[in-house]
């Protein structure tokens, strides 16, 4: 579905009020999520080294945004677009017991995302795994 904004659309909140609401939710949501689902917070990577298999390509056709890292001999890194594999690795690394899990605030870029009213190239989402 392409981006669609009705001609008679009016925002319910002023832009600064919307930003305050987003900030409020980003402050209270993780605590509630962690308590209810027995999760601990972990910091997500913004990028991972190419070729490690950590950057989950979702359906097999996504092209990762990548760049060379000079101090690693120009090895390439990829901006994450999914943390599915990374989260499962962290569950094992931290030896998180069954019934418990982890969550993160993932920031990603999905260059091949089909853009519409709810999908963007930039992704800012809560992500969790148990």
Q: In which residue ranges do the predicted regions lie?
A:
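Class II aminoacyl-tRNA synthetase-like tRNA-binding/catalytic domains
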Residues: 2-119, 129
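Short, solvent-exposed loop/turn segments at the edges of secondary structure
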Residues: 121-125
């Amino acid at each position: 579905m392409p981006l669609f904004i009705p001609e008679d659309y009016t925002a319910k909140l002023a832009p600064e009020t919307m930003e305050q609401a987003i900030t409020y939710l980003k402050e209270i949501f993780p605590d509630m999520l962690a308590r209810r689902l027995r999760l601990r917070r972990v910091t997500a990577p913004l990028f991972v080294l190419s070729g490690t298999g950590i950057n989950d390509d979702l359906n097999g056709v996504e092209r990762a945004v990548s760049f060379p890292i000079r101090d690693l001999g120009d090895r390439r890194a990829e901006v994450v677009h999914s943390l599915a594999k990374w989260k499962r690795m962290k569950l094992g690394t931290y030896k998180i017991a069954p019934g418990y899990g982890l969550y993160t605030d993932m920031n990603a870029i999905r260059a091949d995302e089909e853009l519409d009213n709810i999908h963007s190239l930039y992704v800012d989402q809560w992500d969790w795994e148990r």
